[in-house]
Structure formats: structure tokens, C-alpha cells
């Protein structure tokens, strides 16, 4: 009886594992993106962690939350997480998110907004964005513009960094 039960359990577990593996490979890149938290690293080594929550009122739209860790050389507010928020439209993979550079560690008195799209056409997914950084240069407000390309990262960000 125990041998039969063990064989049935083994077959059942193997069947579930095979189904989960097949489902993961059949899932579109867009759906994998929405399945949980994902980390994206840009050319400066900065990390954006996104969590997508379905909008209760807008179809195919997701609220974006998470953290951004700035690692760009020559900038302030580095190495510590800042909350990010935004929106994602899954109909054509368009995203917009922003960060206010103020937390318990530092206040850089500035804000950055990124707008872009996810490109799933290559062997590795890319998030292509344009950004605007609003800040004060002395006593004069200014806006700096640029572009970031983020690559999805399989590395995890330390939980302590994400909760600071």
C-alpha cells in the first residue's frame, strides 16, 4: 500500500511540475512580466523593481509600484531605494513611472519621470525609456533629459534595500 501511494504521489507531483514548466514556457513575455516583482537594470547600473497590480477601473491597465535604486556615477541619492509609482498599459506594453528623490536617507529635492515601452522582440527583454529630471540648479528650476535602456535582471535585490 505504501509503495502504491508513493508511486501515485510521485506521478502526481511530477505531473504538476511538468504542467507548471509547460505553462511557464507557454506564457507570453508580457504575462511573465505581470506575474510578480521583476528587476530591471539600466546602463548606469541603477535598478528598477516593478510590481504590477491590475487597475480596478481601467481594462488592460496596471498600477505600478516598487523601488528604484540609483547607481549612476556623479549623482546624489545613490545606493538606497526610493519608492516608484506609475502605470502600465498591457495592450501595447507602454509604461510610465516616476521617483521623488526623498526618503529617510537623503532628500535630493528632485523628481524623475520615465516613459517608455517594453520590447520583447529580441532574445532578452528591454525597457526603452526617455526621462526628465526636474531639479533646482542654485535657485533656478531646471529639467534635464535623457534616455535609459533597462534589461531584465534575474538577480534579486536585497530585501533590506527594498524596505528602507
UniProtKB/Swiss-Prot annotation:
It is found in: Secreted. It comes from the Bacteria. Biotin binds at residues 42, 46, 68, 70, 76, 110, 112, 148. Residues 32-155 form the Avidin-like domain. It holds the Pfam family Avidin. One of its GO terms (molecular function) is biotin binding. The C-terminal segment plays a key role in the formation and stabilization of the octameric configuration, since the short afifavidin (lacking the last 5 amino acids) is only dimeric. The exact role played by hoefavidin in the host organism is still obscure. Forms a strong non-covalent complex with biotin and 2-iminobiotin. Belongs to the avidin/streptavidin family. Exhibits a dynamic oligomeric assembly: the apo form exits as homooctamers, which dissociate into homodimers upon biotin binding. The X-ray structure of the intact hoefavidin reveals unique crystal packing generated by an octameric cylindrical structure wherein the C-terminal segments of each monomer are introduced into the entrance of the biotin-binding site of an adjacent non-canonical monomer. This is Hoefavidin.
